[in-house]
């Protein structure tokens, strides 16, 4: 893809990608290297372009429909450790400034009403302290229990919070209410947030929840504008991720690959023209 609509400002080894060679994403990092740790571990960091997320090119302003921001989260990692090789590391005295600059730059290169998907692990630094570095309030976050340290948080440029801002948040009590949205909504939204009800809630077709979810997700894509973002979050962690992927009309860009640990599925999609990619090509586990 000549002009990818999604920018990953610090791709690392692309751990949360469903396709590590996704042409929809311009993957950047400050380093390009291959490290062998011990006898059996090899870490590849091979971005499309080398950039520092604290200072992105000036001519990228308002260029991207979505930004992925998964910065290093360790402040204590050995110089030759596997953790530093795979995830990188922040300086314990300057991490606030580093993340603040990263947030500002990520939002700067977003188009109006674009979204930034931020991923964080609280191994060393609490999420609350990290969010204090952001210049805007988050739009939403994937709730996780105390046993999970990983969080997905979504920011919208220009503080989009309402339908007039191109935002649609859908949390229906009955899935059937979501399978046939108003026709006039077609192509109206830049961002759709979809959180289906639990399978124990009324309204699901007995024994056919995948059909219901397929119809609902198709409606989500229908009401999106081209290059619009779909945020899918669902508490049904007992449902295998593979089963959900069979219901999606397009391949996800990134997501929570281990929902049983976080007790919630989180997937990020973007509406694009059909790229001819079959399901078997992108279900990479």
Give the ranges of each region predicted by the language model.
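Class I S-adenosyl-L-methionine-dependent methyltransferase catalytic core
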Residues: 1-285
